[in-house]
């Protein structure tokens, strides 16, 4: 579960390294799970890339440390909280995605992120 003030790692090559969640998008929502969109501030970035430190960006959560329960009864949990930066059209800002992503992203129409990911769990 991601909430305000939560730090996340960035799972793409957009130039940002760490994000801090500012707001979970949706009608008065407190927590974000895999596939949810958040507004975040860039806390650490690579120099001379598309994003700079203190930029406010939108990102979709791709991995959470909290257990993710599936309808089949399975549950998965990742080692870190990670997000991928997106633009207004919900397309990723980077050209590569690092690490595994959850299958729930495909159900939420983030097919571009799923196709860039090396592994879908």
From Swiss-Prot:
Matches recorded under Pfam families: Ribosomal_L14
GO molecular function: large ribosomal subunit rRNA binding; structural constituent of ribosome
Identification of the protein by name: Large ribosomal subunit protein uL14
Alphabetical list of PANTHER family matching this protein: 50S/60S RIBOSOMAL PROTEIN L14/L23, LARGE RIBOSOMAL SUBUNIT PROTEIN UL14M
CDD domains: Ribosomal_uL14
SUBUNIT field: Part of the 50S ribosomal subunit. Forms a cluster with proteins L3 and L19. In the 70S ribosome, L14 and L19 interact and together make contacts with the 16S rRNA in bridges B5 and B8.
Keywords: Ribonucleoprotein, Ribosomal protein, RNA-binding, rRNA-binding
Keyword RNA-binding: yes
Function: Binds to 23S rRNA. Forms part of two intersubunit bridges in the 70S ribosome.
Any one biological process term the GO annotation gives: translation
GO CC annotation terms, alphabetical: cytosolic large ribosomal subunit
Organism lineage string: Bacteria, Bacillati, Cyanobacteriota, Cyanophyceae, Synechococcales
This protein's record includes keyword Cell membrane: no
Entries under NCBIfam families matching the protein: rplN_bact
Record family assignment: Belongs to the universal ribosomal protein uL14 family.
Encoding gene per record: rplN
InterPro entries on file: Ribosomal_uL14, Ribosomal_uL14_bac-type, Ribosomal_uL14_sf
